[in-house]
Amino acid sequence: MRSLIRSGALNAFLAASLATGQVLTWDEAYTKATSDLSLLSQEEKVGIVTGVTWQGGPCVGNTYEPTSIPYPSLCLQDGPLSVRFANPVTVFPAGINAGATWDRELIRARGVAMGAESRGLGVHVQLGPVAGALGKIPSAGRNWEGFSNDPYLAGIAMAEAIQGMQSSGVQACAKHYLLNEQEYNRDTISSNADDRTIHELYLWPFYDAVKANVASVMCSYNKINGTWACEHDALLNGLLKGELGFKGHVLSDWNAQHSTVQSANTGLDMTMPGSDFSTPPGSIYWGDNLAAAIADGSVPQERLDDMVTRILAAWYLVGQDQGHPPVAFSSWDGGAASVNVTTPEHGELARTIARDSIVLLKNTNGSLPLAKPASLAVIGSDAIVNPDGANACADRGCNKGTLAQGWGSGTAEFPYLVAPLDAIEEKLAGAGTAIITSTTDDATSGAEAAAAAETAIVFITSDSGEGYITVEGHEGDRNNLDPWHNGNLLVQAVARTNTPTIVVLHSVGPVTLETILAEPNVVAVVWAGLPGQESGHALTDVLFGDYAPSGKLPFTIGKSEEDYGADWTTSQVDDFAEGLFIDYRHFDQYGIEPRYEFGFGLSYTSFNYSTLSTSISTTPGPTTGETIVGGPSDLFAPIGTVSAYVANTGHVAGAEVVQLYIGYPDSAPSIPPKQLRGFDKLHLVPGESGIATFELTRRDISYWDVGLQKWVVASGTFEVFVGASSRDIRLTGSFTV
């Protein structure tokens, strides 16, 4: 089993990814930007902050090009997993899969590779990564674009992705800021959350993004406590630019701007796409209207100068003044690029991430890995590429064939798509295995195929996406958490032929599995998420035992939809009544037994935990440091470490994600029983031991005090939980502050 083996080329790429860094500091970038500012005319300044209208340039967003300085029309392009519309590009696994790897190195490398392809195509601002939707609602349409509904895991992934992307010379854009937690009514709903919930959940990963020097942040469509996100003074000026010390620029989501003067004065720096989507272009809030507002004093000149300085500084920060390539594609004519930015290493990286994100949920009596059986039934439409073509549905707005992306603006055009059946046939070529197929979702046909086989693999799906596309009655958000296309009935029909049945689930997030798990002949269940272009290869790597599965769930799978405590609403208001208690925090707080808990994932080997060591030293009380990029300077001060020994006690090589959870003392008011505050992925051969080390900061043991308006370390005894998941705790300890 080759759990630890990667090609020399990929290892070299990973090593180089970790060695990359920022081109300039913010101070250096601001010095250059300030020098340029004095050379610009008022018209040029307004052009830099205003989009040139929808489809007014080759990219989904474009700005006006000044002539007084050597600065281009900026190209802003989706997205969070590849370069939208362009081809050829590498279609990486979705953010939710990257999160399921729990692997900092792979998430950083994914960012480096995506950034390199974006830069090679001339993109200046890559619209990703995603921390909003965070994922409080398990059925929300765009959760899959982000990494996890846990803010700590999401924050670590955001930082790694941003550092990777920007090291390749492209500006990252952290989105969607803030509380954009559902698609239904996303452009009218008011997300009403209290200050503490905002800080400890939804703002948390944006702290990490800003600390990682993210160049830009996208404000969202929704209102927050009654005020539009893109004209929210407390949100943009108070929190983002004030408390977090953000130095980059804030750009609107496409048509999320609602005013000229108010949006300018409350912190918006760039409007996208500059007009609405009508043809010819309709309302334009900035451009001439912004110039007029400055002329009559409604918007101070200093505010425009600040907008321009922030945008120019972000451009300098990542070295885009140093030979950045011209835009090499058009979003509006099929996207054929004049250069090929894909590489073999990027393809191998996509396969590695997809493979390492696979979560083994059930494995009765070692049913996996599969030997090469005499006969194998492969069942379900998810086993093959969409018969109309992998890219047949615009923005992947259908669920036909194998599911490897969700739908919406966060998608890309497949250069190729390896379907599971293709990879299985490739894997078993020459093995003498008879492969019997039923590549529809018809239960009768599936049962007939299974009855003729020694083992059956059933492929099922659950899809979602952005609300401007409706797929099979789902308006972005999922209507429920059931498998699509009568997946429960298909699995039942197959399993009731008494054939050992393996279920492979391609989904955007949690799916209710109780009907499937009630079938005694369902011997294994695998969650493969949205694995991108190398889907089939990654899956067969695990199914046939070339690699041990090492993914862990970045969300909880409950036994029913009611278990989660949050759902999307048809109302114009969401009061976020669940507060801090989402996902595993909710399950823990209310004593609900999940089907598969947050952080869960089986392996083909076993691991033993021992020798917990805790060395923490700090003082209780609030933060007192000055604001730097990322927040108060002492918030990220190291306070010590927790460590544990982990040994591979099985017979094959494997990787274990060792997880640290912290429980707060009673002096911390109304707080979840435990919260993720560290993870370390150890790759171990049989008999090998390693040390999982978790370095803690003050933030990791702080809560937000609404009265003080500061992060506070509570006094008392903190509980330490180290384990293989949020419920599988192997070691416990404590420390006192």
UniProtKB/Swiss-Prot annotation:
At the top level, the lineage of the source is: Eukaryota
Give the Enzyme Commission number.
3.2.1.21
Q: Where is the active site?
A: D253
Which residues are glycosylated according to the annotation? N225, N340, N365, N608
Show the catalytic activity.
Hydrolysis of terminal, non-reducing beta-D-glucosyl residues with release of beta-D-glucose
Task: Describe the function of this protein.
Answer: Beta-glucosidases are one of a number of cellulolytic enzymes involved in the degradation of cellulosic biomass. Catalyzes the last step releasing glucose from the inhibitory cellobiose.
Q: What family name appears in the similarity comment?
A: Belongs to the glycosyl hydrolase 3 family.
User: Under what name is this protein listed?
Assistant: Probable beta-glucosidase L
